[in-house]
């Protein structure tokens, strides 16, 4: 799940005067982080009792927290539409989260639409806009629009230079487009921002192997495994190391003289 928890947990605090609905919203979000199944039931009932956009926002969050992204997308989108009708500036964040869930659900076209609506609002902070641009880049690349994805990532890096994910995804995309000098620059920045992220070490190895630097690739993939041995990145790194070993020529031995 991409960036869902930190952003949605900010939503309850966005209004200056807490109402009963705001209190219930905060309680619902908290429950969703601990027991998403119960929060799904609670938020669904709340929505049926005229809970409005806040009930739907929590319902969508709970569904996404429970990895039911395909169900979360329309509910978060509905929350955004209803919030716009109420003049609630959190609509932009609801659109952002609908887009985030759509990416996880494998619906990049819906994600681009939702994220574009989110970014059309002026209510997002720069770091939030950067996150939305990163998500939009993911969706655009999934749709085969690499140039548009590059532009979105460039905007994200400008909005939030401290956003390590923006630099990491920029590195990955540059490598795939065979822009290896750019990829190296991006991954070095990402590594400085996210020194303990196995995804960064894995990508650093991928860039090194693409550049023909087997030794650096090996070291980076070994580091990936050392950082997070039980991660999916470690599984990939292990496979990459095995492939590298298989492709390497066997050491030759000098014949012994008699």
Regions found by a protein language model. Give the residues of each.
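Alpha-helical adaptor scaffolds
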Residues: 103, 121-193
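Helix-start (N-cap) detector for alpha-helical repeat units in TPR-like alpha-solenoids
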Residues: 21, 53-54, 87, 92, ...
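Structural marker of alpha-solenoid helical repeat scaffolds
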Residues: 48-49, 82-86, 121, 125, ...
